[in-house]
Each structure stands twice: as structure tokens, then as C-alpha cells.
């Protein structure tokens, strides 16, 4: 089961938290669509800013958006001009007050989404899929990953028949729930069609907090 399911979804509530944190009854569907619109808008507007994920919290008529990015300077802009323009655009999109937080990703080579997007961009620039994957694996292992697995699927190298090829180094224990495994996907638009990229990065075990460990011992 651990081999097939999304590793982040499997670990939610155990070692991962939800990316949308709010509660609603009647308005649930509307707010969910609003979240999707916010994420879609941010990913389009900041597609060159290495945005990994967007967290959304809600309270009354206010939306708190946290953007995790490897290039905070590009998101903030000169004197905060970019982030202010983004805040106004999101406020117009949602009709609510929007507050934006920006969190810098210190090690982008350990972020699966950013690694997948990097491989996808290289494939679009006609870099060999083997070379792109192997370079990404080397960078991740140098950055301190315990293990990494990458997979590309599609008409690789312009072949007539689509296939999948994957490379891995180290260990990636998908069944171990306390294993901190980051998972990310991306798509490369090549002249031969789309190529899908998947990346799994094992960053080490997350041990339970001392309080939980004490409760378990009672």
C-alpha cells in the first residue's frame, strides 16, 4: 500500500499537517474551490519563484496565506511591491482581507516539488532525461538526503512508445509512517508531448515528541 499511495497524504495527522487549516459547514465546497483558485493563481503568477507549497488558514473574513519559496526576494519584490500587488490580487479574487507570509526554503535540493520542477524544466530544454535525473539525485544526496527516487514517464527522448524510467539512491522507506518522505510531481511540455516527473525524498525519521513518548510509556 505504501508503494502506491501519495506519501504526504498517508502521513497527514501523523508527522505531516494539512495545507489548508480551517473549518466550515455549509460553505465547505465554496471555500475549497476558493483555496484551489488561490493556489492556481499563485502557481501561475510565481512560476519562476520556486514556490513549493501554499498553506491557507481562515478566520472570520480573513485569509492567511503562507508561501514556501526558495526565492523570497522574487516574491517580495523591490520594497515589497510584488507581495503587495499579490495581496491586492488575492483580496480581489476572494473578496476577503488577505495576509501573506513568506517562508524561505533553506535547502531547495531537499524539496521534492522543486526538484521535480527542476527536472521538468531541463527536459523542456532538451537535456537528456538520464542526465537530469542523475544530477538531481547527486545534488539531493550532497544536501543531506538519506535517500531519493526519481521517475519520468512519457515519450522519453522522442520515442514512439511511452515508457517510465526511474533512478534511486539511498533508502526510501515508503511503508514507515515516521519516515519524513517528501513527494512532488511536475510536468514537462516537450515537442513530443507531456512528460510526467515524480520525486520521492527521504529526509530521515521524525521521532515522536517527548510529551507523546511519556504518554506512551504510561
From Swiss-Prot:
Disulfide bonds: none annotated. It comes from the Bacteria. Signal peptide: none annotated. GO terms for molecular function: mRNA binding; rRNA binding; structural constituent of ribosome. PROSITE patterns: KH_TYPE_2 (PS50823), RIBOSOMAL_S3 (PS00548). Residues 38-106 form the KH type-2 domain. Keywords: Ribonucleoprotein, Ribosomal protein, RNA-binding, rRNA-binding. GO terms for biological process: translation. One of its GO terms (cellular component) is cytosolic small ribosomal subunit. The keyword rRNA-binding applies. Transmembrane segments: none annotated. It holds the Pfam family Ribosomal_S3_C. PANTHER family: 30S/40S RIBOSOMAL PROTEIN S3, SMALL RIBOSOMAL SUBUNIT PROTEIN US3C. Belongs to the universal ribosomal protein uS3 family. Part of the 30S ribosomal subunit. Forms a tight complex with proteins S10 and S14. Binds the lower part of the 30S subunit head. Binds mRNA in the 70S ribosome, positioning it for translation. This is Small ribosomal subunit protein uS3. It comes from Geobacillus kaustophilus (strain HTA426). The gene is rpsC.
